[in-house]
Amino acid sequence: MTLSMYHYIEQTWQNKDWRRSILRKRLIEWRRQPAITRIDRPTRLNRARALGYKAKQGFVMVRVRVRRGGLNKPRPNSGRRPKRMGVYGYGPSKGYRWIAEERAARKFPNLEVLGSYYVAEDGMYKYYEVIMVDYSHPVIRSDPELKWLQDSVNRKRVFRGLTSAGQKSRGLTKSRGLKGTVQRKWKKKQKERQLKRRHEATRYYRLQHSGRKIPGK
């Protein structure tokens, strides 16, 4: 079977030597640019075409830079234990790709988000490319595959969690449930804390009936 051009593009992106040499130079240039930058063409053509991108009028490509890490929460002035400060260990309740889509939609309010994909990351930022469509353009209105964007029910769809990134963060993807979402991680961590408290509370009882020496006795 003959492999398509997009197969070789994907192999190029998976090549570590290529990522160290060429992509590193691009990251240095991208960091100097604004956080939301309009670009002429998609960087990963195979991913863009898989999400519905077409090289025609009405399509706009935007590269968004999102800061990595947890939330930058203010440190309280009143005294308390460091673990109760509520500063560290808190991350955003949304995925970074969803945040990038919302920022692009606020930058271009006359466009609708069709999809997005991951591009690259460095020690401080993550970079995503968002596919945006001008639903009022005559070329888009006459396209049978894209004219659904002009319906009023699809306005501001990114802010209602209707994109792929939004559905993933909400745990609505098929045969996935909450697996891999932020909600599942917090539920798992909460369950671990409850088991740990229960374990520490019964430690003295377990040591007393096991015949082992109880610390401090």
Curated annotation (Swiss-Prot):
Residues 165-202 are annotated as: Disordered. GO terms for molecular function: RNA binding; structural constituent of ribosome. The keyword Ribonucleoprotein applies. GO terms for cellular component: cytosolic large ribosomal subunit. It comes from the Archaea. Coiled coil: none annotated. GO terms for biological process: cytoplasmic translation. Keywords: Ribonucleoprotein, Ribosomal protein. It holds the Pfam family Ribosomal_L15e. This is Large ribosomal subunit protein eL15. It comes from Sulfolobus acidocaldarius (strain ATCC 33909 / DSM 639 / JCM 8929 / NBRC 15157 / NCIMB 11770). The lineage of its organism: Archaea, Thermoproteota, Thermoprotei, Sulfolobales, Sulfolobaceae.
